[in-house]
Amino acid sequence: MAEEQRWQEGCHRLCANNCGFFGSPATLDLCSKCYRDRQGRESTAPVVVAAAASACPATHPSSPSSSSCPAFLPSSTAAEAGVVVAAVAKASRCASCRKRVGLTGFACRCGGTFCGAHRYPERHACGFDFKAAGRDAIARANPLIKGDKLKDKI
């Protein structure tokens, strides 16, 4: 009975986006998913605005009405981001034999996705230099220590 009264008091509200889940006042009456989506949009918006500002040089700072920058620049950068997402989703085939790999694809350090038969570097003519990468990793992990040039330091 007390639980029904708490329900009717209005502490539980449906999400403001009408997705069917409950929102809370701490998340602006949004459910957790809608709130995360909104936070993601707000965090990427300054990046797009900054990219638009850097892409449009200010030729005449005294006359802001004669801007040569297109107003649709943020949508074009969003379209470029869509191209990147499409390229990532396109890697569902083996780079050597074009066989569908689905979820079992093996990503190589050369950047390709391969099936079980071509997953090893020797099998798909990998262009990645594993020896140089290993040398660089060892050089970063173990910096060269040089001794003092003056032997009789006071």
Curated annotation (Swiss-Prot):
Residues reported in the UniProt entry to bind Zn(2+) 1: C15, C19, C31, C34
Zinc fingers, A20-type class: 9-43
Zinc finger (AN1-type): 88-134
Superkingdom of this protein's organism: Eukaryota
UniProt binding sites for Zn(2+) 3: C108, C110, H124, C126
SUPFAM superfamilies hit by this protein: AN1-like Zinc finger, Glucocorticoid receptor-like (DNA-binding domain)
Keyword terms of this UniProt record: Metal-binding, Stress response, Zinc, Zinc-finger
InterPro entries referenced in this protein's UniProt entry, alphabetically: AN1-like_Znf, AN1_A20_ZnFinger, Znf_A20, Znf_AN1
GO MF, any single term: DNA binding
Keyword Kinase: no
Up-regulation conditions: By dehydration and salt stress.
Residues that coordinate or bind Zn(2+) 2: C94, C97, C115, H118
Keyword Zinc-finger: yes
PANTHER family noted in UniProt: AN1-TYPE ZINC FINGER PROTEIN, AN1-TYPE ZINC FINGER PROTEIN 3
Function: May be involved in environmental stress response.
UniProt-recorded name of the protein: Zinc finger A20 and AN1 domain-containing stress-associated protein 5
UniProt gene name: SAP5
